[in-house]
Swiss-Prot record:
Its EC number is 2.7.11.-. Keywords: ATP-binding, Coiled coil, Kinase, Nucleotide-binding, Serine/threonine-protein kinase, Transferase. Residues 44-77 form a coiled coil. GO terms for molecular function: ATP binding; protein serine/threonine kinase activity. InterPro entries: ABC1_dom, ADCK3_dom, Atypical_kinase_ADCK, Kinase-like_dom_sf, Prot_kinase_dom. Residues 231-565 form the Protein kinase domain. ATP binds at residues 237-245, 259. GO terms for biological process: ubiquinone biosynthetic process. Pfam families: ABC1. CDD domains: ABC1_ADCK3 (cd13970). This is Probable serine/threonine-protein kinase abkA. The active site is at residue 401. It comes from Dictyostelium discoideum.
Length: 565
């Protein structure tokens, strides 16, 4: 199992260094030299010429900041259009629970040229910052700048976090997605200050100007789009990686959420992924198998830009959840009854606009140990863990985006609203059977069973050395701890204290061994699965939950075996 770094790689939308092949003009050739020099430095630790390289890159950065790509005046002129205070609804009585975005609208760069330019500036800035940090550490005799961890920490500095946050927020799309993924890592994976800075990316992405908003609404719903609503709030209540969300009231009086896709995002996914790879190659070793994850990530993100597909996923998920709750035969009612999926308003939904029932509540990123008691936090964690296991072993269909804002707690009605079904996938029964067997091996502390089913799943080839086999077995043992009665008994536990056990940190300690000894990439299905499971564990850890996870696991395990054919 690839651990936390592999989880990042799998969702970071990296790949081959295609930036180099795209570079044709002088600026791009210079950037190519920059990337090659940076990779050479990172791989060979050629500290003799470090100061000279840093000076060259500083000059390049200054030069790039003075240049401007003219692209028919389409995107590079960042006109800052301020949202009007029009006669939109709720201007006089806005919901205080919601954070309306009244900042300047930033025009999103939508052409390939303008987005390439943004990535080039970011790469140069991050690279110059990296070399500056390496130079400082080389001069400091107390620092061992030749170590891999030194290169890693030289990338993840506060200054580079600020660069990424600003750039990702401006570009949205795949770029902003990586910022959001980085922002929900725990402190065992990234420096706390780095996570804190990038958390702004997740919470405060820039909205688009009204001009772009109105153009999209007109293109998708017609020039008379406002006539399809009683009221429409121009100020978005959320701005994320692919689109932003507005409140509205339909003609029949329903309060709805209207998600509007950013212009050009769908067309930029592939090139964005290729451009991001140039940044990842500074820190990611070859054995991380970026190439394998690239196509999966690209396909997943492209599906997220199709809101008709998301509407279909949401309706399917709603049907599966309600059928399970209402069946009354398998006992899932008590595990899933407090979960809710909003309705979809299909007549106001297109490929670029998604309209759904508006739900109220507090996203789980705002739930803290200071403002909610243990019982409430445990209730939330039980629901999130039950949902994750139901998706795998009962529905065989999973929403794989663990963004904390996708879970909204409605305390008044005591339910958790589930949002954002753009990233979903089905799992075949054969894969789930082998995966469950490997987890059961961990639950029963059976190393042979873990390795047997790791081989069947495709984690191993059978030719791995003892170090790799041991690391694989340990990762499964750690992952399965919350579900193991034997582990509870051995450690005198009645419930599993997620925060104390630090699952992510312990698995991350196995990463160097795996990256050094791995012979093949992890199975493709686990990229998204482990992103979701990791997110689930992080929620339980953040809330300092103490729950009997064995009961939940055994329930959904039994459902799977009952239905398995």
């Amino acid at each position: 199992m690839g651990g936390r770094l592999n989880d990042l790689i799998q969702v970071a939308y990296g790949g081959k260094n295609v930036i180099l092949s795209m570079m044709k003009n002088k600026t791009r050739q210079t950037s190519s030299v920059f990337i090659n020099n940076l990779n050479s430095l990172n791989n060979n630790n050629n500290n003799i010429s470090l100061k000279d390289k840093f000076k060259d890159l500083k000059d390049l950065k200054d030069n790039l900041n003075e240049k401007k790509i003219n692209n028919d005046n389409d995107d590079d002129d960042e006109d800052n259009l301020i949202f009007d205070e029009k006669k939109d609804f709720l201007n006089e009585n806005k919901n205080p629970e919601l954070n309306y975005i009244k900042s300047k609208g930033h025009k999103i760069p939508s052409s390939q040229t303008s987005r390439f330019w943004e990535f080039t500036k970011l790469a140069v800035g991050v690279g110059a910052g990296f070399l500056g940090e390496k130079t400082k550490r080389t001069i400091d005799s107390s620092s061992s700048s030749s170590s891999p961890s030194s290169s890693y920490s030289a990338i993840f500095t506060d200054t580079n976090a600020e660069r990424m946050a600003e750039s990702f927020s401006r570009m949205r799309g795949a770029a902003l997605k990586i910022g959001q993924v980085l922002s929900i890592q725990d402190e065992s994976f990234l420096p706390p200050k780095f996570v804190e800075i990038l958390d702004r990316v997740r919470k405060n992405a820039n909205p688009i100007p009204l001009e772009q908003l109105y153009n999209t609404m007109s293109n998708e719903l017609g020039e008379n789009w406002r006539s399809k609503f009683q009221l429409f709030q121009d100020d978005p209540i959320a701005a994320a990686s692919i689109g932003q969300v507005h409140r509205a009231i339909t003609l029949d009086g329903k309060e709805v959420a209207v998600k509007v896709q950013y212009p050009g995002v769908a067309d930029s996914i592939t090139s964005d992924i290729k451009n991001l790879s140039s940044l990842l190659k500074m820190i990611v070793p070859e054995t991380a198998y970026i190439e394998k994850s690239l196509e999966s990530a690209r396909s997943e993100l492209l599906l997220e830009t199709d809101y008709l597909n998301e509407a279909s996923n949401q309706l399917k998920f709603k049907s599966l959840l309600e059928s399970s709750i209402n069946s009354g035969t398998n006992g899932s009612f008590k595990y899933l009854k407090d979960l809710y999926v909003p309705n979809v308003i299909m007549e106001l939904t297109t490929k670029r606009i998604l309209t759904t029932e508006f739900v109220h509540g507090t996203s789980i990123d705002k739930i803290t140990i200071e403002n909610h008691n243990q019982e409430t936090r445990d209730w939330i964690s039980k629901n999130i863990l039950s949902l994750c296991l139901a998706e795998l072993f009962e529905f065989n269909f999973m929403q794989v985006d663990p963004n904390w804002t996708n879970f909204v707690v409605d305390f008044e009605n005591k339910r958790i609203n589930l949002l954002d079904f753009g990233a979903c996938r089905n799992y075949k029964s054969e894969f789930l059977f082998n995966y469950l067997k490997s987890i059961e091996g961990g639950v029963n502390r059976d190393i042979n069973q873990i390795l047997e089913y790791s081989l069947k799943l495709g984690y191993l080839t059978g030719d791995e050395n003892k170090q790799m086999n041991d690391a694989q077995a340990k990762s499964i043992l750690i992952l399965s701890e919350p579900f193991s009665k034997l582990y509870y008994k051995e450690n005198n536990l009645k419930t599993y204290p997620f925060n104390e056990k630090q699952i992510a940190k312990r698995i991350s300690q196995l990463i160097p061994t795996m990256l050094k000894n791995r012979l093949k990439p992890p199975p493709e299905e686990t990229y998204s699965l482990h992103r979701k499971l990791s997110g689930c564990y992080l929620v339980c850890s953040k809330l300092k939950s103490n729950i009997n996870s064995t009961l939940i696991f055994n329930h959904f395990k039994n459902i799977f075996y009952k239905n398995y054919k």
